[in-house]
Amino acid sequence: MKNLSFLTLFAFLSVGFVVADEPVDEDVEVVAEATMSESSDAADDEDVQELGRVSVTGSRIKRVDIEGATPLITITRADIDNAGFQTVYDAVSNLTQNTGSVNGENFQAGFNASLQPINLRDFGPGRTLVLVNGKRTADYPFPYNGESASFNWGAIPLAAVERIEVLTSGASSIYGSDAVAGVVNVILVDGLERQTARVVAGGGVNAGSGGETLNLEFAGGGFGERYSYTYALEYYDEKAVPISSRSEHDSYKDAQDGGLPSRGLLIRDQFAGAFNHYTPDELIDGLTAPFDPSSGLVPTAGLSCQDAGDYFAPTETEIGNYVPFAVGAWCAIDTSSNGSLTNERKRTAAFLSGTYELTDSVEAYAKYVYLETDTIGTLDNLFTPFVWVAGPQRYGRQDSYWRPNTSTNPATGGFQFDPGYSAFMDFRIQKIFPGVYRGSSYVEDTSTIDFGLRGVLNNGYEWDVSYTENTYDVVQTGRNFLASALYDKIHNIGGVDGFGNPCVLDTNDLLDGDPSNGEVDDWWGIYGYSASYSQPNCYNWDFYLSTQTQADAEALRVDNVEPADAFSELFQATLTGDLMQLPYGPLGFAAVIENQTKGYEVNLSELNKQGLLWGIGGVDGGGERERNAVGVEFNVPVSENVLISLSTRWDEYDDAVVDVDRRTAGATMEWRPKDNVLVRASWSESFKAPDLPYSFVGERRFFTSQTDWYQCWYDGNFGNGGENCGGAYGIINIEGFTTGNLGLKEEEGDSYAVGVVWEPMDRMVVTIDAFHIQLGDIVSTKSLGALTLDEAVCRARAAGDTLDAFPDYPDSYCSQVIGNIVRGGKDFTVNPTPEGSITQIYETPVNIAGQEFLGIDTAVSYAWVTDKAGDFNFSVFSSHQIDLKYAEDVGDPLLSYMNNTYTPRSRQSLRLGWSRGDWGAGMSVLRVGHMEYL
């Protein structure tokens, strides 16, 4: 389905749609990208105007020529309007260089369901530097994916934007950390002379498609003898796009493999490996576990899937596809269309700026931006945990043992079912609630104040001294099952069992509990299960086998409120001018001094911290860091048509524990063999300081299952590479923790670009640029499977076994790995290790990974001016990824991942525009190229 978005701006109409040879996202529109040689007003005036010296992103030295040594894209406010975009995020997310995948509002189950990030060149959201008026801002408060930093493009009001400049190559020698894949600089509006009102409405042409938008703007300003002022107000309202509105996603049958429905009501006999068999007419009680003392049967006879809720009986094919569960069946539910593709969002914003001339050579300026956003996202159907109804199986390893026969509940003295092998009971049950959904809401407040002085010295040098403060506050609210209430409901705690005994919780009911020594584990963990070993007759069948209303589910849930905040305080001073006159022109010079303090804090709720909520994780923590930087640039004209630029910068980061400093250098070249040809090249060292969350993230708790490679080696079954360590060495319900690492160092790399700009005729520009970006020592968390394997290798080598098939690990690494894996648990193997089985695993971020990008950007733009028919504009842009490589660990070779799922080969955009007097129309198209679907 193609969606058309209509823009009404006075008498202006814009239409946007998407095409692709393999449709990937048919609801995305693209920004009209323009090189700096292209002006939005170029077609309105055929007279060539003399340009003054201006400063553009990529260098602090002002220049006359708009095209320079570094590839730059400029998106003006007119370009945004012509493309039909209504937000800054729309504009930047549709850059052809935005080829990487992200987890934001498109992934409601993640840590950042209100975030709108971009990912240039697939280096990650945190490796593109974002500036506002050339100055750094605060990060999004919640860590990206729970571990790194990112910028939220939904936090900049469009009403305050004059243009967006995008440097598409690395530039750490100019801007410092984060400028790896590029720099995006948002220039705020200034110097308005009249009042302007905008009313913009958009939406899909098909009823119920969602995404309807309304944007109201009012802006104005004025000038006095020595002052100027500008203001803008904005209100933005966007409806959610439900998954059900997209025909390619509204049924489980849309999946490429034919699709399978979800198992909405599941009752599985673990011991028999079967399910109770449900048909459209009857829930057949094919299993005879003594849940009901009167009949000895599961109370499902005579029930249908429809009786238990909005379920349906799966087909025999669907049953068989759930291997190895083809013995029985289950009640099915279609959950594929639940949730939202984009959030419901309301935003209000205010912007105010002004200048005042203190003297003829000194000016004071100030800018203030405030934005409040309310966001609501929907994830999927509410569901219960898997529940073990009965059975004496104990999990410490993937082995089981029989608890001694007993007929007395130690807590109540009543009869309990555990008579021995003949009546072994072990049922796993889960229910997905029809019509009851999970989701979160976010309230965000951001404010920025920027004020300073700027002027011109007697020798012509221009200077600017400023202070910028940015704050970002977010409150996330969700509704989650209170674990105790859910447990009480499922197991009828407070009621009586089939024999009249009170239904209570005792140590036999706790997952992995050992009654002989009082050992218990939390059954309400993120991936934990509740159990009813002692009193299976207390199980609340009505909770599963009857229709549950939303009110029934809501009664078991509580609000979970978790705030987060981030801030940035920046002092910046710049100086630019001409040092001296050289034979071929002036020696340009620019210098910058910066001091920035930034920080963040995430506060999990006490319920979440204590593990009292079911089905939710989280990560808390916080910290701050001070950064000092000094940079300098020189423009050296070496001939009439060759200009060389040199830059260097020193950054020092102090997080009160570890100091990180980095010196970077860069160079660019411009060669103009003809008036209409520019050959350019650039190189810059790149670096990224460790993200604050990587260093200061609080403890994140989870549960995992892993192979005990060390036990396998200890038993003599390891072989050359652990190929004999199968399921017998698996351990489930290992408690895991993620913590920060204050000992991280900076990521380092290089960025290269070479290209040509050609103007074959008036008003036509062609550009071709090739890029090569390398980055090493990337901060990442090693997979838990790799950690447990490396632990075995380190312990084996310490015992004298060389294990030549594995790389050489330094002693420091082995000490860290062994320390991250906690042992001491009971081991029920014949030959247990002296250290015991794994009980806990700690993962910490480390500098281990590497990445490389090779690609080409091309662009063609043309403006055709007529006397009567109006003015026509045409632009087409393309970003082609030649190769993407990644290494997961130190010493690993860089391997191409171009054939990975959802890695696009290219992205193209097209813009068409027409204007005549007060009328105009525009169309923008985005194409996402071929990618693998595995």
Predicted segments — roles?
Residues 191-195, 225-226, 359-362, 456-462, ...:
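Short loop/turn motifs that connect adjacent beta-strands in outer-membrane beta-barrel proteins
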Residues 90-96, 100-114, 123-125, 135, ...:
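Surface-exposed beta-strand-turn/loop segments characteristic
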Residues 116, 182, 212-218, 227, ...:
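Hydrophobic, lipid-facing positions within transmembrane beta-strands of outer-membrane proteins
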Residues 195-199, 229-231, 360, 364-366, ...:
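Transmembrane beta-strands of outer-membrane beta-barrel proteins
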Residues 771-933:
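Gram-negative outer-membrane beta-barrel transporters
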Residues 201-205, 224-226, 235-239, 370-374, ...:
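Transmembrane beta-strands of outer-membrane beta-barrel pores
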Residues 479-492, 594-595, 621-717, 724, ...:
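Structural signature of Gram-negative outer-membrane beta-barrels, strongest in the C-terminal barrel
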Residues 52-83, 89, 140-145, 195-198:
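N-terminal periplasmic "start-of-domain" segments of outer-membrane beta-barrel proteins
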